[in-house]
C-alpha cells in the first residue's frame, strides 16, 4: 500500500463555539484510490467536529488530502472507511434526492490563492483581523499574540519567523 508522508491539518477558530450545535462531524474518515498494490491512501482516519458558526480551514501540503477531504464533506466522493455525520445524524447521500437535501444544508467557500491575501498586509495583520472578527476584540495583546502563534504552529509555521518578532 502506497502512503504519502504528508500532514493534513484542520484548523478551526474556536472562540465561543463549544456550546453551539454540532453541524458536521466525522470519525475515522478515510479515502483510498487505486487497486491492488497501487493503492494510495489519500485521507487517513480523520476525526473532526465543526459547530454552527465556526470558520474552518483545511490546511496542508500539496497532496496531503485537502481536496479529497473537501469532496467527501460535500458528498462529491464517498469515503472508503469511517462515517460523516450531519446535524448529529449519520449522513445519507445514497440517492440523488438525499444528496440534494444534504446540499441544501451545507456549503463550501473555496479560496482563490491569488486573491486571498493582500501582499501588502503582514501575516500578523491578517491573523489579528481574524481574531477580532470572531469575537476576540476584547482580548489582551498578549492573548492575541498567543493565539496567532498557536495558529501558525498548528500548520507547522513559526509566527516569529513570519513576522520578524
Residue positions per predicted region:
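Helix-to-loop junction immediately C-terminal to a conserved catalytic motif
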Residues: 74
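Conserved Walker
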Residues: 67-68
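The feature captures the beta-strand-to-loop junction immediately N-terminal to the Walker
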Residues: 59-61
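Q-loop/switch helix immediately C-terminal to the Walker
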Residues: 112, 119-133, 147
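Conserved ABC ATPase "signature" region
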Residues: 142-161
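Conserved ABC transporter NBD signature motif
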Residues: 82-92, 102
Amino acid at each position: 500500500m502506497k502512503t504519502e508522508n504528508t500532514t493534513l491539518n484542520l484548523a478551526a477558530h474556536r472562540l465561543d463555539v463549544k456550546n453551539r450545535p454540532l453541524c458536521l462531524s466525522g470519525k475515522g474518515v478515510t479515502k483510498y484510490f487505486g487497486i491492488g498494490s497501487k493503492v494510495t491512501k489519500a485521507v487517513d482516519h480523520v476525526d473532526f467536529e465543526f459547530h454552527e458558526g465556526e470558520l474552518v480551514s483545511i490546511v496542508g501540503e500539496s497532496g496531503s488530502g485537502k481536496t479529497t477531504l473537501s469532496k467527501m464533506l460535500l458528498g462529491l466522493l464517498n469515503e472508503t472507511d469511517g462515517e460523516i455525520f450531519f446535524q448529529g445524524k449519520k449522513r445519507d447521500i445514497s440517492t440523488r434526492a438525499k444528496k440534494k437535501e444534504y446540499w441544501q444544508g451545507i456549503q463550501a467557500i473555496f479560496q482563490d490563492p491569488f486573491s486571498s491575501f493582500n501582499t501588502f498586509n503582514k501575516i500578523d495583520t491578517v491573523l489579528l483581523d481574524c481574531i477580532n472578527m470572531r469575537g476576540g476584540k476584547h482580548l489582551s495583546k498578549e492573548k492575541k499574540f498567543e493565539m496567532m502563534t498557536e495558529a501558525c504552529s498548528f500548520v507547522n509555521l513559526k509566527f516569529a519567523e513570519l513576522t520578524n518578532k
